[in-house]
Amino acid sequence: MFHLRLVPDNTKIPFMNGRFAGLITSAFLSIASIILFFHPGLNYGIDFQGGIVIEARTPQAADFVSLRHSLGGLGMGQVALQEFGSPQDVLIRLERQPGDDAAQQVAADKVRATLAETLPGTQVRRVEAVGASVSAELFANGMLAMGLAMVAMLLYIWFRFEWQFGLGAVVTLLLDITKIIGFYAVTGMQFNLTAIAAILTIMGYSINDKVVVYDRMRENLRIYKKMPLRDLIDLSINETLNRTLGTSMCTFLSVIPLALIGGEALQDFGIVLLLGVFIATTSSIFIAAPILLFLGENRLRRGTPEAAGPGNPATTP
């Protein structure tokens, strides 16, 4: 059976030679991202800054392309469209307009008129202004979701492996997330509930990649008791390199269409996922692994049963 090999089986790349460069680069980018988070800050979407919510039903399946074009030309800032329920039901969200409640009503009336002109027969079923308190609650819930996901992953790694692996995984995840947030700050892309979904997806992908590498490290710790930890980590990464690169490449290729032709709703999501796949893959090699090396092999090897390996050959009865 044919097996695709992106790298030869006996590859021996000394990844740990680049551990300092990897950690320093990662720390620099994460610190810069934190600074950018505070200044100039994130471009919060309608979900997190309030706005106007309009529910409408079109006579036929909604034409989202025409609606985006028509509503986007009103000059009212961000306009988000979402299908809910049937294909005829449309949820329209506008950013909050300058002024008081009367200004919000004027904006809603403009949307009504545009809907009637673009898709005659459309019924507006609900108009509601989303205040700052609701938006703040959505933002808090999004942050809570990321925090709970982080804790759950820490506990999973901690119980499946040892605390050193859990610490390395969580520190690496934090560095990964800060870079993604910095990307949002630099590009000015909307930070909304879709952004939260993208970050959670990247977190899941990243931890899965690290579990594969960590599992091989744990296995090799039991097999090669006398091998220096630095060499063992390099060996483990090289042994899983085909799997890591293959998974990353397949994920990357599957997300490219979202980033290129996903439309307004999915394009930002796809772009962030592409960046996240790259960050997660490189961090498994140049961040998570060096953290284990710095924790020291005495802690990692403690309690590991003796096994055959270089310098510790198996004995036969």
Describe the function of each predicted region.
Residues M1-P317:
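A structural signal for conserved, well-ordered secondary-structure elements
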